[in-house]
Curated annotation (Swiss-Prot):
This is Interferon alpha. Produced by macrophages, IFN-alpha have antiviral activities. Interferon stimulates the production of two enzymes: a protein kinase and an oligoadenylate synthetase. Belongs to the alpha/beta interferon family. It holds the Pfam family Interferon. GO terms for biological process: adaptive immune response; B cell activation involved in immune response; defense response to virus; humoral immune response; natural killer cell activation involved in immune response; response to exogenous dsRNA; T cell activation involved in immune response; type I interferon-mediated signaling pathway. Disulfide bonds join C24-C123, C52-C166. GO terms for cellular component: extracellular space. It comes from the Eukaryota. Residues 1-23 form the signal peptide. InterPro entries: 4_helix_cytokine-like_core, Interferon_alpha/beta/delta. SUPFAM superfamilies: 4-helical cytokines. It is found in: Secreted. GO terms for molecular function: cytokine activity; type I interferon receptor binding. It comes from Felis catus.
Length: 194
C-alpha cells in the first residue's frame, strides 16, 4: 500500500528534526531541505505505480540499520550521510544520463541533496575532531556497508532492467519508502536515547 506523498513528507520532517537535534551544528534548515527533497522526489514520478506492478522487487531494506543499537551520534550521522550520498549518486549522476526526469525538478533535488551532504559532512568532521567517528575506511561502521549493499542491489536492478522507465519508477518509490522508514525509525531511536 503506497502512502500519500504529503503524509510521507510530514513523517520525514519529524525524523529530520531529530537528526537536527543530534548536537552537532546542523542548521535548522536541514529539516526543511529534507522535506523539500522528499516532495521533489514525489513530484518526479513519471508513471502510475499500477503500470509497473510486474517490475516490483523486494530490495530488502535494512530496517535494523535504523532501528538497531546505535549508541553514538557518530553512527547515526554516518547512516544518514551514507543514505543521502547514495541517493545523490542515483539521481544526480546515474539518473542524469539514463532517465528522463523533469530537468527543473532534478536540478532542484540535486542541489538540495548537495547542501544536505555538505552540512552532514561538516558534522561528521566535527565528530572526527572530537574523537567520536572513525578516521579510516577500516573503521567504517558496519551499518554503512549494509546500506551500501542495499543501494548496490538497487543499482544492479536498474542495470538488469536496462534502466527502463518502470525500473526507475520502482527505484524512485523504493527510495521514497526508504526515506520514510529511515526518518521515522531514526526519530524513534533518538527519542529513546534522551
Amino acid at each position: 500500500m503506497a502512502l500519500p506523498s504529503s503524509f510521507l513528507v510530514a513523517l520525514v520532517a519529524l525524523g529530520c528534526n531529530s537528526v537536527c537535534s543530534l548536537g552537532c551544528d546542523l542548521p535548522q534548515t536541514h529539516g526543511l531541505l529534507n522535506r523539500r527533497a522528499l516532495t521533489l522526489l514525489g513530484q518526479m514520478r513519471r508513471l502510475p505505480a499500477s503500470s509497473c506492478q510486474k517490475d516490483r522487487n523486494d530490495f530488502a531494506f535494512p530496517q535494523d540499520v535504523f532501528g538497531g543499537d546505535q549508541s553514538h551520534k557518530a553512527q547515526a550521522l554516518s547512516v544518514v550521510h551514507v543514505t543521502n550520498q547514495k541517493i545523490f549518486h542515483f539521481f544526480c549522476t546515474e539518473a542524469s544520463s539514463s532517465a528522463a526526469w523533469n530537468t527543473t525538478l532534478l536540478e532542484e533535488f540535486c542541489t538540495g541533496l548537495d547542501r544536505q551532504l555538505t552540512r552532514l559532512e561538516a558534522c561528521v568532521l566535527q565528530e572526527v575532531e572530537e574523537g567520536e567517528a572513525p578516521l579510516t575506511n577500516e573503521d567504517i561502521h558496519p551499518e554503512d556497508s549494509i546500506l551500501r549493499n542495499y543501494f548496490q542491489r538497487l543499482s544492479l536492478y536498474l542495470q538488469e532492467k536496462k534502466y527502463s522507465p518502470c525500473a526507475w519508477e520502482i527505484v524512485r518509490a523504493e527510495i521514497m519508502r526508504s526515506l520514510y522508514y529511515s526518518s521515522t525509525a531514526l526519530q524513534k531511536r533518538l527519542r529513546s536515547e534522551k
